[in-house]
Structures are given as C-alpha cells and as structure tokens.
From Swiss-Prot:
The protein, known as: Probable Fe(2+)-trafficking protein
Source organism of this protein record: Azoarcus sp. (strain BH72)
Pfam family, one: Iron_traffic
GO biological process: cellular response to oxidative stress
Keyword terms, alphabetized: Iron
Superkingdom of origin organism: Bacteria
Family: Belongs to the Fe(2+)-trafficking protein family.
UniProt key word Iron: yes
Function as written in the Swiss-Prot or TrEMBL entry: Could be a mediator in iron transactions between iron acquisition and iron-requiring processes, such as synthesis and/or repair of Fe-S clusters in biosynthetic enzymes.
Length: 90
C-alpha cells in the first residue's frame, strides 16, 4: 500500500514520495508533507525556471536559488513568477 500524506500544496490527502527528494532538513520536510503529484508539478516549474533564467546548475548560486525557490513553492506561498509565461486556459 502506498504511503499517504496530507499534501500541503494540493490541500488533500495524496500518495507520498518514496524517498526524500533532496538531502537535509528541506528534503525531510518535503518528504513528510508533499505528494508525488505536487512534486511532479514542482519538477515542471523548476525546469521552466532553469530554462527561462538560463541557469547553469554547475554554478552553486543557481543551485542555491533553486533550493530557495523550492522552499518558497511548497512552504511560503509560491516561487518567483516566470517572466513571459502565461498559463494555459483551463
């Protein structure tokens, strides 16, 4: 049976991650309170952040920026907006 979490991003109970996605305290917090579905949403958003901001992941500043954005995305109400991005109409 899948591990269920009360996902803070989706606001409902959903299947939890199998392992902490990142090391450290942030990874533990995400593991305990973020669902697989919400994590996949973050991965897509992170990809847009990397591409639109032309981040080089070899640069420690870029990795720090993404870590900060990840924390904002899940625990502080949202990450930085992506310049020029218009979400599709639903």
């Amino acid at each position: 049976m899948a591990r269920m979490v009360n996902c803070i991003k989706l606001g409902r109970e959903a299947e939890g991650l199998d392992l902490p996605p990142v090391p450290g305290e942030l990874g533990k917090r995400i593991y305990e309170s973020v669902s697989k579905e919400a994590w996949q949403q973050w991965v897509k958003y992170q990809t847009m952040l990397i591409n639109e901001n032309r981040l080089n992941l070899m640069d420690p500043r870029a990795r720090k920026y993404l870590s900060e954005q990840m924390e904002k995305h899940f625990f502080e109400g949202g990450a930085d907006a992506i310049g020029g991005f218009v979400p599709p109409a639903q």
